[in-house]
From Swiss-Prot:
PANTHER family: SWARMING MOTILITY PROTEIN SWRD (PTHR39185:SF1). One of its GO terms (biological process) is bacterial-type flagellum-dependent swarming motility. This is Swarming motility protein SwrD. InterPro entries: SwrD-like. Disruption phenotype: Mutation abolishes swarming motility, reduces swimming speed and torque of tethered flagella. It does not affect flagellar assembly, flagellar number or surfactant production. Required for swarming motility. Increases flagellar power, probably via the flagellar stator components MotA and MotB. It comes from the Bacteria. It comes from Bacillus subtilis (strain 168).
Length: 71
């Protein structure tokens, strides 16, 4: 889950696993896999950072250990 802020200043928590698309035109709009849209104050880069941190937290995004696979 990631915490984001509506344009009216109200914070809310969103399940990042259901995010399908993030657009900026000019406000950041998050579209979920069910088609529901949320317009938030955070810019696209901030939302992407929150998603990556969430994925690392739940271990979907493994941290690079610097281990190279043999060719």
């Amino acid at each position: 889950m990631i915490k984001v802020t509506r344009l009216n200043g109200q914070p809310f928590t969103l399940n990042a696993l259901f995010i399908e698309q993030i657009e900026c035109f000019p406000d950041t709009t998050i579209t979920l896999s069910n088609g529901k849209k949320f317009v938030v104050k955070e810019d696209e880069e901030a939302v992407l950072e929150k998603i990556a941190a969430f994925y690392r937290k739940i271990q979907i995004f493994a941290m690079d250990q610097g281990i190279e696979e043999p060719e």
